[in-house]
Amino acid sequence: LQLVFNTLIAASAIVLAALSFRLVYVTARFFHFAHALTISIGGYAAWSFFNYCAANPYWAFLSAVILTGAAGTLSFMVFLRPLMTKGASPLVLLLASLAIHLIFQHTIALIFGEDARSVWSLEQMPVYSFAGGHLTVVQCWLIAFAVGVSVLMGCSASFSIFGKQQAAVAEHSELSTIFGIDVLSVQMKVFLIASAVGGGLGALVGMDLSISPGMGFDWLLPGVVALLVGGIYRIRYVVLASVMLASVRTAVIWYLGSMWQDIFIYSVLFLYLFLRPEILVGDEMQ
């Protein structure tokens, strides 16, 4: 049963990374690698609120989500929006996003150091036991957060006005403006929501495991792989791909050791990019 719990935990983290990354991609139509920063910022924000402000874990999590959402929106307005206004290609936006990620990742390392830090010690964390399996309270939060985000994003994409506006902006931003859609408002909301979800993932991972300056990309990469395998425009298949990827990843760790999990992820990513290299520089809407 513990293997099932481990799979659920890994799948929840992958789902959150995949769906938050997807939200930006389907609207802005480029690979936003700087989204990994939101995961790192969320982890360090939770650590800072927990240690410096003596906030309880619940408020540390909420504060990290709010702060990361604001930071992601600000980075879009300052760095990416001017490039998009000038008609920058998806490749240019990808390179700019990668540069932003590297600059701020090293900035985090300069401020907090390279060493891994623990937000919440395991000795202080409540642990629940179910038929021989164990889940910490943070792991329960992570699973609940992933389920909630998946349901809300699925319903929003299918039934809400914002979901229809998002699809219109993704299809043709200029035509959307003609029809009265505030494109900038939609894009800001997308980056706000995606960054907040990424920050929540970082905060929960930091409470459950540890934080480090490069943690964002380590957690984003499996999400990107699940997104590509499941299909960018089908949320339910992204969730299914995340569960399948987590299951195989757990099996790899169990039988071969944790050192092989990254090799597995990179192998799947390489195979997909080998078959569809155009995905990195823009893809046609299905």
Segment roles from a protein language model:
Residues 111, 171-178, 182-185, 256-286:
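Cytosolic-side transmembrane-helix boundaries in multi-pass membrane proteins
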Residues 26-31, 60-63, 70-115, 159, ...:
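Short loop segments and helix-boundary regions at transmembrane helix junctions
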Residues 23-43, 57, 87-91, 162-165, ...:
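Short, non-helical or kinked segments that cap or interrupt transmembrane helices
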Residues 83, 89-159, 186, 256, ...:
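Transmembrane helix-bundle core of multi-pass membrane transporters
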Residues 1-7, 13, 157-161, 188-227, ...:
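Inter-helical junctions in multi-pass inner-membrane proteins, predominant
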Residues 1-52, 78-88, 92, 231-235:
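Single transmembrane alpha-helix segments in multi-pass membrane proteins
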